[in-house]
Structures are given as structure tokens and as C-alpha cells.
Amino acid sequence: MDADSINSFFLIGALLTAVSVLLSPMSSRLGIPILLIFLAVGILAGEDGPGGILFDDYSTAYLVSNFALAIILLDGGMRTRVASFRVALWPALSLATFGVAITTSITGVMAAWLFDLHWLQGLLVGAIVGSTDAAAVFSLLKGRSLNERVGATLEIESGSNDPMAVFLTVTLIAILANVGAELSASFMLISFIKQFGLGVLLGLGGGWLLWKLVNVSKLAEGLYSILVLSGGLMIYATSNKLGGSGILSIYLVGLFLGNKPTRGRHAILNVLDGMTWVSQIGMFLVLGLLLTPSDLLDIWLPGLALAFGMILFARPLAVWLSLLPFKSFGSRDRWFISWVGLRGAVPIILAVFPMMAGLPGAQLYFNLAFFVVIVSLLVQGASLTTAARLAKVELPPKPLPISRSGVEIYPKSEWEVFVYCLSESKWCIGEPLKRLAMPDGTRIAAVFRNNTLLHPSGSTCLEAGDILCVLGQEKSLEALSNLFSQAPETDEVSRFFGDFFIDTEVKLADLAPIYGLTLDDETGAMTVADLVALELGAHPVLGDQFLWQSLHWVVAGLYEGKVTNVGIRLPADA
């Protein structure tokens, strides 16, 4: 490659990236996933588009996609709270193993019938598209206030279901590439255990070593993110090299670092946020360039049948069977989890495996994977907001600061500055600072009014439009945000939680005359907390609800895993 070619490469790459960024606001206006915008830019720049760029280097696409996916999973792991594993780990693992196997089997049968394939080839197609995609799930769920059990289950499933898909794909390729040869059950079992076992072992062990290394190193602030990124990629590559799941490993590395007091944590997250955007853009641009849309015309009708068969039949059946042991999931939860079986980069990456192995029909597998991904993003991704509303799994948005940043006062510092803009509706307008009931361990560090820094004292009265900079820790974020930030509309809160909020220590007998409850001696002695435990089990989450005596009872407050109050919706409001 000469200097002119290199400059052309930089120019085209920068131009496509800039166009992707500038077109990204269209996703919210059109109601489509932003990943589809990036993919469309790549397709338009490709062989069949006005750009006319000829790109068919599957090895480069595989390299770029794996690198990008590793960064996305590292960032996603660092933003996942380990507390969510309390309610979502086992359901997510069931979906990541049994769910993938069931989806693969059903989709494989449909593929074999629709495309007149050998049943093993059909299963290979099912394995390729059988897992949900972490990049798509993290991207589309980011910023949404979903029921914790549902949201955490989807995120953990997407971060942990790739080992099963990779195991099935690699095993089926080995069988098809050596027709007549038998793969022993012990070999397959060992391969499966290596994928999961090494993935978990290297992820948690490597995460611990990397955490220790980061905290003992004295580096320039900008170097911590590079250390985490390079360390995560080393663990990812090592896991893959030894036969484990690098995808699972790097997700667990991020999870470990994100839930431990880590030096430079906020700076690391800021850098990873930008790197994740670059990775998503780069990955879907390259995959878009790789696709030749005209190749999809020959398979569009059976391809649609396969995609919708997976969306409407295979995925829902897999979800319902996988979640049978978990009674805490209601029918609405299961329906929404079924719908958010998003496919993205991972099926396309897996579809490259048969091409690199030189299998007959590999191009068909690749085109099918691409077709399924496009349909999934268009149908499931674009309707995600509507699906969440219909399933009633999206909570009213939590009040949050307009920005937050870390204060690296000392290693492992957990102090942050939260910035709030006061609206006219806040009760604290006109009140002196000394009358504010601030959470323990927090302090107003600065007040700005009309672009001017004030010198506040206890008698300083707050005005609408004031900007407050508050020093505190994440544990105080909810209380601070309730005090200062813009709260969701009252109608939105009452529509979800109901108009009446009841403390869980109240006895049902005291509520009976108010709400017309019919109680026997046993239920009359129960508190609301007893009723919630009876109906929802040991680990309820915010937004959980149940119907009892014609009233809808909704968990409206939690503290350290314990329900503190519930909302009551009357039948007419349900």
C-alpha cells in the first residue's frame, strides 16, 4: 500500500465515520436503532451502493468485529451492577444455555425445510443466529429505566450466551467438515466446559489481577484506561487461545473492575464510552461494506419466513421453557424478554467461521445471518419502546443530575460532583440553603446563577435556573436527585405505580375498610410486607406487581433489597 492509498483509506474511513455520527440523530426521529444507521451507511458506501467500494476481506471484518465486540463488552461489564445478579443470574444463565440450544434446534429445523438443507446444515444456521447480541442489547437498553429483573436478565444473557453459540457453531462445522467422522460425546462435553469454565476462570481471575495492577500503578490519568483496555484484550485473547470464551471473559473483567473501588474509574469509563461508540460505528460500517445487498434478493422470501419464525416462535418458546423454574417472571416479563431477542454483530461474526473453514454453502449461511440481523434490528429494535410500554416493564424515568464526574482525591476515591439545574417546580426554590435536608456525607460545593459563581452561605436562597454542584457519593445519588433534579410527570408516576402509596408495615386489616378487602383471620394479621413476600417471593424489584382482591399492588420503594412501600392501582386504572 503506497502513501496515496493510505491517505485515501484515512479519508474514506474518516468521512464514513463522520457521516455516521452526523446521521445518528435520525435514529430517534425515525424510531430505528442507531446501529442500523451505521450499518446502512456501510451498505450505501459498499459495492451495490452509490459509494461503490468493493470490500470482501472476511478476515479483516472478523478482526475488526472481534476487537470492537471486546471493547463493547468491557464497557458493558463495567456499567453492570453486580447487585443485579441477585435477581437475574440464574434465569440469564438458563437462557444463555438451554435457551440458545432450543432456539438453535427450532431455527435449524425451519432453515433445513425452507432452504432444502441437510439437517446438520440447518442446525448450523440455527447455531449461527441462535444467540442474542451484546452490542445490540447494551446499545438499545442503555438509558432505559426497565424493571431490574427484566433488564438485568437481558444484559447478563447477552454477555454470557456466546459460549453456547460458539460451541454449537464450531462443533457443527467440525462435523460437516469431516463427514463420516464421529465426534465423541466426551470431546463435545469437554469443549463445552472449556468454553464456559475457562471463560469464567480467566475473566474473574484476570479481572482481579488487572484490578490489583491498576490500583498499585502510579500513572498519568489518561494511561489507566489504556492499561485496562490492553489488559482486558490480553485476557480476551488468552481465553480464546486456550479454548475458552473470550467474550465471556472480557465481560467478567469489566464486571469485576466496575464493581470494585478502582483507581481512575471515572476517567476509565469516560474513555471507554468514546471507544464503545467508535467500536460500534467501525464494526457496523465494516459489516455493511462486506454485505452485497443484491445477494439477498434470492433469499428474501424464505429469509423473511426464517427471521419471523425465529422472532415469533423459536425465541418465545425458548424463553418460556428456559424460565419455567423461575416463578418471579410474570407473563408480561417473559413476553418482553422474548421480543428483545436482538441479533447483531455476533451472528455475522459466527457466519464468517464456515467461510474461513471453506464449507460448501458458506455464502448462504453468511447471507442468512445478515438477513436475520437486519430484520431483527428493524422489527424488534425499532419496536422496543412500544413493546416495553405494552408489557409494562419500563418504569417512570428516575430523576438524575444533568452531569456527573469523578473527583480523584485519592486512589480508589468514590467521590463525585453531581450537577443539577433547579426548575420552578422544585419545593426548594426560595428556600435558604440551611433549610435543605441534605443526605449525610454530601455538600453543595458551588452555586451558579446567570453564568456567575456565587459565594453561598446558609442564608443564600435558591432560585429557578440555579446550577448546583453537589459533592457526594453514588449511594446518595437517589436522595440528591429527588431533592434537586427534574422529577417525572406526576401523571406518569401515578399511571404506573397508582395514586395511593402504602407503607409495607401497615396491616392489611387497617386497609380493609378503605379498599374493601375481604380478610380472614390469617390475612387480617398480615402486613403489606407479608403480602408482598407471599405473592412475589424473596427478591422483588421496583415495578413488580400482582393482582390481589381486584387491586393492582406495585412495588414502589426499595431499600437494601427490602420493600418499603407499594402503590395501589384501582381496577379502572390498570
Curated annotation (Swiss-Prot):
Q: Does the keyword Repeat apply?
A: no
Q: Which GO terms describe its cellular component?
A: plasma membrane
**Molecular function (GO) terms listed?**
flavin adenine dinucleotide binding; potassium:proton antiporter activity
Q: Where are the transmembrane segments?
A: 6-26, 34-54, 58-78, 87-107, 109-129, 173-193, 196-216, 219-239, 242-262, 271-291, 299-319, 335-355, 359-379
Residues annotated as domain RCK C-terminal: 405-486
| Compartment list | Cell inner membrane
* Keywords, ordered alphabetically: Antiport, Cell inner membrane, Cell membrane, Ion transport, Membrane, Potassium, Potassium transport, Transmembrane, Transmembrane helix, Transport
- Write down the membrane topology: Multi-pass membrane protein
- Return the PROSITE patterns for the record: RCK_C
Q: Mind telling me which Gene3D superfamilies this protein's record contains?
A: 1.20.1530.20, Regulator of K+ conductance, C-terminal domain
Q: Which GO terms describe its biological process?
A: cell volume homeostasis; intracellular potassium ion homeostasis
- What does the record give as the reaction this protein catalyses? K(+)(in) + H(+)(out) = K(+)(out) + H(+)(in)
Function, as annotated, reads: K(+)/H(+) antiporter that extrudes potassium in exchange for external protons and maintains the internal concentration of potassium under toxic levels.
Fetch the PANTHER family from UniProt. Answer: K(+)_H(+) ANTIPORTER NHAP2, NA(+)/H(+) ANTIPORTER 1
Give the family, as the similarity comment puts it.
Belongs to the monovalent cation:proton antiporter 1 (CPA1) transporter (TC 2.A.36) family. NhaP2 subfamily.
Q: What name appears for this protein in its UniProt entry?
A: K(+)/H(+) antiporter NhaP2
Q: What is the lineage of its organism?
A: Bacteria, Pseudomonadati, Pseudomonadota, Gammaproteobacteria, Alteromonadales
Gene name, Swiss-Prot/TrEMBL: nhaP2
